[in-house]
Amino acid sequence: VSSLIDDLTALAVVAPFPLAILFAIYKFRTSGRVRIARPKLGLLNLGDADFTAILNEDRAALGSFFEDVVVSTDGRIPRCDVLFVYASIAPDGSVVNSPQSSVRQLAAGAGASLLVVASSNPGEHVVATVKNPGPRNASLVLTIDRKGDGFCRFFQKIFTLMKAGKTMPMAWAKVAPQHESVMPKYAPETVFLPEGKFVVFK
């Protein structure tokens, strides 16, 4: 318990972390981590040609972190550990052209521990999708602004740390401390919800 308190105190000094991040760290320290030795990346394009370019960018920049990469353009949800979704989010939070209405249901369909909506969507639509139902078995990253190549730079750093044994919340806290003075300028504008099991790629 004392080591946990020390860790949280140290983090609080560095930056004022959101309560969700602090809870994620507590959950990790008390429940351990799940190791995925050969992680599989799924890329699900629900917007056809609208998102082909950024999907290809992400595959080229991030594919080497994974044992296998599966691309789906026909609406079928690929089975994978990490699912990147390229789609428009409707004002009510539903996923346009999706076989499932919510991002949590998409994650469950893939069996993924992490789902990233990798296409930019309006902030109010992102807030709406967070409220939609579904199993909370995967952490979610919802993108508001990719910031050009900043998106790939950011996730390269995240996945590098995860391969070194850091969980997603710990990697996120290291790469993007929640304070304007230390937040990287290139970092994409996102909403991160640490849910489900915390995994490492090792």
Locations of the language-model features?
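Hydrophobic, helix-forming membrane-interacting segments
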Residues: 2-30
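A domain-level signal for caspase-like cysteine endopeptidase catalytic cores
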Residues: 26-90, 98
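Short acidic, S/G/P-rich loop/turn micro-motifs used as interaction or catalytic elements
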Residues: 48-51, 88-94, 121-124, 147-149
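Conserved strand-to-helix beginnings and helix N-cap segments that scaffold or border functional pockets
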Residues: 52, 96-100, 127, 152-155
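A short acidic, amphipathic alpha-helical/loop segment
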Residues: 54, 58, 106, 125-132
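Structured loop/turn residues at beta-strand edges in well-structured enzyme cores
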Residues: 78, 110, 136
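A short, glycine/acidic-enriched catalytic loop
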Residues: 88-110
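Active-site-proximal C-terminal subdomain of hydrolase catalytic domains
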Residues: 113-202
